[in-house]
C-alpha cells in the first residue's frame, strides 16, 4: 500500500473542502463493516466536484506511476472506486475492470466486469479502507480469476491495525 504524507494531507484538505468527511460524535455512523464511528468519509461525492476529482485522480496516478512499473490493468473495487478507478485508468492509458462485492446471479455471473486476460498484473484502487475486508475480498476475486495483484492504493485509509 502506498502512503505519501504530502498527498495524504492534500487529499484530506480536499475531502474536508467538499464536506466528504462528516463528524457526528453524538450519533455515530455505522460502517459497512458494522463498526460504529463518529467519522464518516463519503468519497462518492468526489465525482461531483470536477477540480477535486481531477486532483485526486492525479494524486492516485502519480502514486501508481511512482510505485508500480509493471502492471497491465487497473481494477476498481465496487462501488465506491468504480468512477475514480476508471478515470485513473484513463489518465494512465490502461484498461479498467471493476470487482463486484458479490458475483452476479444472472447473465455471465461475473465477479469481475470488463475485459482482462489470465495472468495480467493488476493495481487495485479502493475508495476507502477501514478494516480492509472489502479490499481483501476484491483481491481474492482477482486472484481466483488468475490475475496477479501488484498492489493496492486508496483515496482514504484509516490505517487501523486490522487493515495492515
Label each region the model flagged.
Residues 1-68:
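Active-site-facing substrate-recognition patch
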Residues 8, 81-82, 135, 160:
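Generic non-transmembrane alpha-helix signal with a bias for helix starts/N-cap capping motifs
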Residues 47, 51-114:
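Conserved PRPP/pyrophosphate-binding segment of the phosphoribosyltransferase/PRPP-pathway fold
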Residues 103-164:
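PRPP/pyrophosphate-binding module of the type I phosphoribosyltransferase fold
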